[in-house]
């Protein structure tokens, strides 16, 4: 068994170390992760500067590591096409410090790395702990191990990965596992405007959650109730329910320029 680990918190983050320890007796571990924190980079990739890779040593002889000066998606691409002699059986991204709930998944480097794994046809999982100052990743690591065993035994459709959010609670207070849909978390952005010593303006961006859809069955509702949330996500973003409606707007497939072309023909004949 070969497992590829990555994250967006950086290769030295405690969450990714908790993962390679939990899989120590089960698989050969390949860690390919950013050399520094790359949170909220989404599915960005690096195409305008070189990617540099540093080979790292781990105490575990079954664990092989590379630090990359790129995004989480870069890390998965490099692992798949350059660094690993054979493709992994599973890609795991995490354990992220902080939740990836609802619309967070659109910005998350953690989630995007798992998405990249699925694009390569490899079963993938993104894992986050809801606390920002978590000192113990044990429950999240154990949950990941359980889900990976299920994933190997049962499989998923090829375009789908699992987004997992684990409450920052002791094991005895975890209220089970719920399979959920995405909720919604909208942010009020905050821009701290500053001036550098040369008089140029710059900004620090932050934000606060101000609009939450935590309806029944959502990932947000589950973690609020103390349960582990497991959300199947796929990369087909098509809103199938609106295909016919939008088609009707556009004349059911006829050329949107038909009327304009007729007018041009009339004008051409008139001038002739």
Swiss-Prot record:
It catalyses: a ribonucleoside 5'-phosphate + H2O = a ribonucleoside + phosphate. Keywords: Cytoplasm, Hydrolase, Metal-binding, Nucleotide-binding. It is found in: Cytoplasm. One of its GO terms (cellular component) is cytoplasm. The keyword Cytoplasm applies. Its EC number is 3.1.3.5. Its cofactor is a divalent metal cation. GO terms for molecular function: 3'-nucleotidase activity; 5'-nucleotidase activity; exopolyphosphatase activity; metal ion binding; nucleotide binding. A divalent metal cation binds at residues 8-9, 39, 96. Its main location: cytoplasm. Binds 1 divalent metal cation per subunit. Nucleotidase that shows phosphatase activity on nucleoside 5'-monophosphates. Belongs to the SurE nucleotidase family. This is 5'-nucleotidase SurE. It comes from Heliobacterium modesticaldum (strain ATCC 51547 / Ice1). The gene is surE.
């Amino acid at each position: 068994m070969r497992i590829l680990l990555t994250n967006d918190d950086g290769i030295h983050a405690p969450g990714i170390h908790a993962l390679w320890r939990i899989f120590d007796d089960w698989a050969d571990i390949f860690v390919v992760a950013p050399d520094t924190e790359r949170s909220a980079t989404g599915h960005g990739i690096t195409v305008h500067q070189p990617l540099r890779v540093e080979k790292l040593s781990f105490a575990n002889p079954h664990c092989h590591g590379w630090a990359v000066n790129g995004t989480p998606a870069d890390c998965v691409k490099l692992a798949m096409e350059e660094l690993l002699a054979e493709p992994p059986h599973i890609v795991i991204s995490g354990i992220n410090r902080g939740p990836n709930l609802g619309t967070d998944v659109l910005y998350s480097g953690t989630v995007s790395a798992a998405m990249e794994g699925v694009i390569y046809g490899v079963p993938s999982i993104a894992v986050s702990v809801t606390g920002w100052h978590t000192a113990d990743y044990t429950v999240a690591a154990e949950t990941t191990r359980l889900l990976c065993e299920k994933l190997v035994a049962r499989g998923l459709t090829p375009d789908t990965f699992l987004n997992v959010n684990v409450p920052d609670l002791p094991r005895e207070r975890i209220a089970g596992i719920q399979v959920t849909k995405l909720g919604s978390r909208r942010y009020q952005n905050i821009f701290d405007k500053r001036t550098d010593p040369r008089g140029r303006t710059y900004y620090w961006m932050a934000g606060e959650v101000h609009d939450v859809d935590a309806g029944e069955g959502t990932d947000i509702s589950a973690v609020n109730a103390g349960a582990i949330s497991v959300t199947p996500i796929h990369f087909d973003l098509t809103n199938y329910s609106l295909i016919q409606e939008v088609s009707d707007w556009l004349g059911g497939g006829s050329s949107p320029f038909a009327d304009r072309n007729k007018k041009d023909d009339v004008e051409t004949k008139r001038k002739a």
